[in-house]
């Protein structure tokens, strides 16, 4: 088995109300693949393939014949096996509503609330909210947060998405008029300059939204109701090419099958088995599905406990536990409450809907969130087999996999019995992860204690940890030794010693973070100790001598209030901007919060991305083969076995390239040697994507390792391994200045790298034409001209033969500037060689492995200052990890050095930067282009000075900030007035000084939780440091019906550039937006374009569109003058009759920009964007976790072209920057392999990471004569403002260290992960853990910054 001669059963289910009957279903086909390939429903997106991002969310509806109810639940389509859907109804975003038929309120509101940018995540967001509303038409805010916890967005910062969802919620607290135009903020108020300005907070009009009518939703198909109530077949069997899927209808049938196929796993939600089979190479020829067996979903309540069927989903378990908690006295629900607590943060809602309790228990994953609690809660597993039922305890022996305490191969888990807790028993659960939700825990724990009646003497004690071994670890020996001990400080001391001795982690333990995880072992027990102590005190049964306030001052009553986890709340905020002038014509959209013009298409799934383009005739698929060595010579590439595989057409190597194989140091396909793990060596072309991907695993490459192998900046410096010369700027006499200061401080700063994590991975479709060697290319890129040039060079054909089309890009952030040209060129070689269209779509793991990201940075600084805080001298030396090739590293180094001074005027200043060459994938352009790393170094110097002077950091910032018209270190003049205004308004709007006092008061009263607050200024230079990179062109056609087609050189990445260009055209032509359209960006309509980057896309392309429209309007003047009362269409028809050209090319020559590095001076940037941000956080010193309490941002946008889009850019960049500085951590193996290459392992911010109060204000009454309509580009500047969260965390850590009498000047390391925060908050627990000599073990991961 499987046997092709056998005939599969028919699979019957519904999609969007229509019946689907499939014969010969392959069990390896997922719902996502079927929807996209078979049904052409491409609204459901493929972004990660592992169930970690939510882009593929759909709703599944199933009827339960036992309870006679129909369940609606969201799932990740990328994990759902198609064969599991027999009898189910699937609803995709296309089935919810469409522009062509009827928009659903969810779709309308997310678009009109400005909740879409690139739009790639939007269908998944829509489906999560839609499913929530099908179950709860008026949900609570908590339910909304839970529903979106499994959905990722890289663009918006989540706030507008949550705002759209909030419109369905029960009326929240706060101003009921917010967003309607009647808010008290929607009135005239004085700005900081004293003048009157119209301030508005209305980005959308809630009253215009259509109401939600639950009666209009699709009904569950009656045919499926009948199927569920009266199934025609007991057992369903589906035979695939490699796997057979069997779904029995009765428990007895399942037991017979399990006896026949004892090695066959049971597959329920496929949340563990699916990813394991895909990425870890696990393979099972037979899969047994118990989903159709009602017996395995039964729930039984008895006087002693709760029995839950093994096939109940974790979401159902959550509801069952919540119901029991509401029915039972509190003393009986201790275990249930602990389980419910973890179920709220375990994965996302979609995974909880899919994963089963039985699968979670049986998998015994080391990071299981429930097994530690179930283990200490005396849970019993009810096993079933043909031989009869059997019970075993969910004990440490079971978790360790001991044969005597485990399932037999022919047994299945039928149900789980969880007993009630009892009087004098306390159960708690703890978990610490990189972020609050949808993240695997670093360490979790379940703990239970039972006391002798009327005493604090331990009668029973159970402790189990996850994340500290290959499975859940039970600390049985420690617990046994503590029996009979009293619950006091002496017991605590002994318990910590015993636990560290028994639950040991080797220095090379999988997952790394060894010292952090060791600390958590005792820190979490201490939390449990305090919780229980508090409960005992509340019962007033604790003997007074049980505490020792001298030895453990933290257990005094005033510190117990610090306990408890951070609660997740729906963020709130105010967005303020300046209204347009009252005299501006209503049809003129410039300055108004116009919805993204693709917003509705995003929300309905009708927006077409690169891989949504329908399959082309004779199309083939390409998959890449990458290096597994960091530095090696290629001895041979053996593809002989591959060419015989089914569907494989060809293997593409460097020998097949007719032209140039990339640059000398950056080959498209490796020749002779490889320089990093992930370098592309060759590619396989096959008839399907699955065949191509499988075939790559069969290519055998023989290597000979080379020396040296360099991964870290430290090693690169040691080996003098650099990619380009040092970049240096200097002013004043720095040596002399250091001799004349009161104090000198020196330090280092480490800033980790960052993955772009655009939701749409790199992808390209190449279609060769039949004549003249022409190619049509559809690419997800920020720079189609670069793709065009690279392909031209690779194929040795003229550029004019290649047309690149870009409809829209699912996020870029700099990652689609250079790399798409490489993938486009490789695909083009395949297309020319085979003569077939080639589609190349990287999966998430390959994308993250190959493409590189933000440059990690290491910096050394020396700062001289007076006791007043005035900085007299500053010397900063920066090194960035460029990876194995130059790419954009020299430019990043230049921008890094140019922008290092940030907002500060320091008379004696030396700034240096170098790009290191290492054996890692080449790092590349990323939003901010070096500024987010460099400015963090400068602000760290400020923090160090503040600590030495005993002054608040904000005072040091104010004292050293630019105050008057001045010149930068590179001699460019500028006026800092907007900078000062932003700073002062941010101080005012955030009530900074009042809150600073409150933070200090909180910290005096709280020992284990600390708050921090920080405000940072920003001077961000916009644009490229070269005039030629600021040029732009546009083409505008007016058709005889009056409609207008606009083409320009910018690319729509989600930043709303197309929307802004049409706003410009509308103003210039004086016509409504409804007349205007942009089809795509194409190298045919606008040639020689510049990359859409550096925040100038809308600015320079807008000037080109403006120019084209002005030319056309000038031509139309005689016609208009002749018929002033005519309509636009009248004028166009008349112009056509008079043979007036209705097409015009617009052009903008660009801003002058230059930099002379020899002299160290120039005018490299057209203008600056100024801003300031204030953030307040609270940290848990015992775990390193933090929550964002509030953020206030003030940004100088001058006259915003579109306040809704610009505020969205600011918020999105801020959250992305916050991720850089707090949760996004790239981990590499000692062999140079990137571990963190999926959303499970690399944590970008989620909805739970948004500050509870998130306010953004565009600085009113600001002007700049240089730019288009006095607007500014805001795409990148908000990134660095995310550092306000970082420095607030640093402030909180400093408060903790201050209270413990530990030095406040500590090494600054970004990201400020829970690991860094916890270990920086040094205390007796960090002191007691064992530390290994680094020379005695090989670490699991290495730092590369």
Swiss-Prot record:
Keyword presence, Iron-sulfur: yes
Tissue spec: Expressed in olfactory mucosa epithelium (at protein level). Detected in skin.
Main localisation: cytoplasm
Annotated 2Fe-2S ferredoxin-type domain residues: 9-96
Gene Ontology CC annotation, any one: cytosol
Binding-site residues for [2Fe-2S] cluster 2, renumbered to this chain: 118, 121, 153, 155
EC class of the enzyme, as a word: oxidoreductase
Residues annotated as catalytic: 1276 (proton acceptor)
Cofactor requirement: [2Fe-2S] cluster; FAD; Mo-molybdopterin
A GO term for molecular function: FAD binding
Protein residues bound to [2Fe-2S] cluster 1: 48, 53, 56, 78
EC numbers on record: 1.2.3.1, 1.17.3.-
Chain sites annotated for binding Mo-molybdopterin: 117, 155, 812-813, 1094-1097, 1209, 1274
Keyword line: 2Fe-2S, Cytoplasm, FAD, Flavoprotein, Iron, Iron-sulfur, Metal-binding, Molybdenum, Oxidoreductase
Chemical reaction(s) catalysed: an aldehyde + O2 + H2O = a carboxylate + H2O2 + H(+)
GO annotation (BP), single: xenobiotic metabolic process
UniProt entry tagged with the keyword Metal-binding: yes
Cellular compartments annotated: Cytoplasm
Domain FAD-binding PCMH-type, chain residue ranges per copy: 238-423
InterPro entries linked: 2Fe-2S-bd, 2Fe-2S-bd_dom_sf, 2Fe-2S_ferredoxin-like_sf, 2Fe-2S_ferredoxin-type, 2Fe2S_fd_BS, Ald_Oxase/Xan_DH_a/b, Ald_Oxase/Xan_DH_a/b_sf, Ald_Oxase/xanthine_DH-like
Pfam families documented for this protein: Ald_Xan_dh_C, CO_deh_flav_C, FAD_binding_5, Fer2, Fer2_2, MoCoBD_1, MoCoBD_2
Function (record text): Oxidase with broad substrate specificity, oxidizing aromatic azaheterocycles, such as phthalazine, as well as aldehydes, such as benzaldehyde and retinal. Cannot use hypoxanthine as substrate.
Subunit relationships: Homodimer.
PANTHER family: XANTHINE DEHYDROGENASE
Family: Belongs to the xanthine dehydrogenase family.
Name of the molecule in the record: Aldehyde oxidase 2
